């Protein structure tokens, strides 16, 4: 029975586009979220699996696992749901889907398939992104359980994105197998030994898989290959991978140690956390000695085998079939399967079959021991023969035919001197260019074979010289979180200053990135240390507010500040423009804080006093001065002068300090007589009159 694929989901919100990916459980389409106007990726479960409770549980688990995580190196999940569709028979069927972040780029698997082994610097940057994602998910209590190149996306901007948490499990549920039948709990080439044995997994299982990914990036191939999933799983449990430097001539041996520690058979010998793994890589790439330098993979393997033998020798109490589910690796599908518990007759039959399998396994083990003993004896004989062969000088070469490669590769020795020293030892130099190095151009970075190795006289020694730090543009990480910005910058090949600086910002939220130094877009050598600036959550009162119009300021800073508007007159600022602010310009306030602005109403206005005709001039002048106006006489101003008229007229609104013109005339003086005697006398007379 088949079901036609819908063209839209969630009531038309998600308009489905072309198919961009297909897996064993689901298809992925590019889609348009019409509500938010953004491009998304929609993973739709295959209709034939939607009615399988096991697969449905896995699908829902992915949505739940990732929805609670928010990390720049993990593909975000935006939404999930189930769409009801009609099958060809007309029956209604559910079609579960997950709406995810759309990442435009390539999977790491495709990149390796096309380009082969990656450069050391690219390996470093990809691993930093993967380990950032794992560090975050582990701290959230989630184990991925299927880390592999196919689940790692590299965006067009170089950002690493880990995806497909479909078999992820919470740490407290990590002992459970994923399904009751045909449930994949990891991909064979990246499977940890404990997963291969069906044991409880923890976050170190993810780190083992990450170590396998690092190995494949360095060499272009997985650490173990075979004709079947069983053969590969067996190697993960019991064999040590070929060192990367043996597969890639010239690759520094320190990568052997880092990969070996990450891929330790005994999880107790692995990196304890993703952060510890990441620190070791950064330490080495920055010229230090990583913790992995002291790791011995052969000791790890022998100790692991001894511990497992001891565990098998411990007395055990048989467990009834209904008490513990049987876990088995299916050699046909390459998958681990959980066989459902049985009861009654079924339980007896199951127990009988289990006893038969145990007897067969015991016989097989005895056979392996015998074969192993024979092989060991043969190897011992060959080793002895080889030693005798060498001691008898069967190669017919004297010690004079071999030379020890001198230590010539260091920052202080020039290319010409290195060549001369090698030639003086009877060796030739083959010059190679190291484009991954951040050392100055011409600096010797490595040799192959290494210094101290014995080689035939006349052999060529490969010597790599730095091509100089390659320049690239600083990515724009403005308005991103510190963690996301750091990941993007490191993925672009830069170092990031551990000390983060803060600065005020009017519009960028607290703790989000405001800028970098060097600035975004600037072309600088890879390996340059970038300093990140983040918002303090405070902002500065703008310095250019005074003199601007009220409307333009309110529009320009809308959402950034809360304004209170007051009015006042001003002799110097035009009406409608801002005269002053509080707090003062340059003051630091919280984002969205209050600023009071005063807006000019223009010069102060006063009313011309009610000066009537006949008022003496002196009185009129005093009345004008009392309200801040000046008097300008148009006529006599003596003590007898009287007002004829004023301009502007009484009651007029004029600018404070302006002049009022008073038209005056001389007043009349009245006659009078009087008599007096000596110094005394009396008299009367008329006053002034019109």
From Swiss-Prot:
<keyword id="KW-0723">Serine/threonine-protein kinase</keyword>
<feature type="domain" description="PASTA 1">
    <location>
        <begin position="399"/>
        <end position="467"/>
    </location>
</feature>
<feature type="domain" description="PASTA 2">
    <location>
        <begin position="468"/>
        <end position="536"/>
    </location>
</feature>
<dbReference type="GO" id="GO:0005524">
    <property type="term" value="F:ATP binding"/>
</dbReference>
<keyword id="KW-0677">Repeat</keyword>
<dbReference type="GO" id="GO:0004674">
    <property type="term" value="F:protein serine/threonine kinase activity"/>
</dbReference>
<feature type="region of interest" description="Disordered">
    <location>
        <begin position="429"/>
        <end position="453"/>
    </location>
</feature>
<feature type="binding site">
    <location>
        <begin position="20"/>
        <end position="28"/>
    </location>
    <ligand>
        <name>ATP</name>
    </ligand>
</feature>
<dbReference type="InterPro" id="IPR005543">
    <property type="entry name" value="PASTA_dom"/>
</dbReference>
<keyword id="KW-0808">Transferase</keyword>
<keyword id="KW-0547">Nucleotide-binding</keyword>
<feature type="domain" description="PASTA 3">
    <location>
        <begin position="540"/>
        <end position="601"/>
    </location>
</feature>
<feature type="compositionally biased region" description="Gly residues">
    <location>
        <begin position="668"/>
        <end position="690"/>
    </location>
</feature>
<protein>
    <recommendedName>
        <fullName>Probable serine/threonine-protein kinase PknB</fullName>
        <ecNumber>2.7.11.1</ecNumber>
    </recommendedName>
</protein>
<dbReference type="InterPro" id="IPR008271">
    <property type="entry name" value="Ser/Thr_kinase_AS"/>
</dbReference>
<comment type="similarity">
    <text>Belongs to the protein kinase superfamily. Ser/Thr protein kinase family.</text>
</comment>
<feature type="active site" description="Proton acceptor">
    <location>
        <position position="146"/>
    </location>
</feature>
<feature type="region of interest" description="Disordered">
    <location>
        <begin position="665"/>
        <end position="690"/>
    </location>
</feature>
<feature type="binding site">
    <location>
        <position position="43"/>
    </location>
    <ligand>
        <name>ATP</name>
    </ligand>
</feature>
<dbReference type="InterPro" id="IPR017441">
    <property type="entry name" value="Protein_kinase_ATP_BS"/>
</dbReference>
<keyword id="KW-0418">Kinase</keyword>
<dbReference type="Pfam" id="PF00069">
    <property type="entry name" value="Pkinase"/>
</dbReference>
<feature type="domain" description="Protein kinase">
    <location>
        <begin position="14"/>
        <end position="285"/>
    </location>
</feature>
<keyword id="KW-0067">ATP-binding</keyword>
<dbReference type="GO" id="GO:0106310">
    <property type="term" value="F:protein serine kinase activity"/>
</dbReference>
<feature type="domain" description="PASTA 4">
    <location>
        <begin position="602"/>
        <end position="666"/>
    </location>
</feature>
<dbReference type="Pfam" id="PF03793">
    <property type="entry name" value="PASTA"/>
</dbReference>
<dbReference type="InterPro" id="IPR011009">
    <property type="entry name" value="Kinase-like_dom_sf"/>
</dbReference>
<dbReference type="InterPro" id="IPR000719">
    <property type="entry name" value="Prot_kinase_dom"/>
</dbReference>
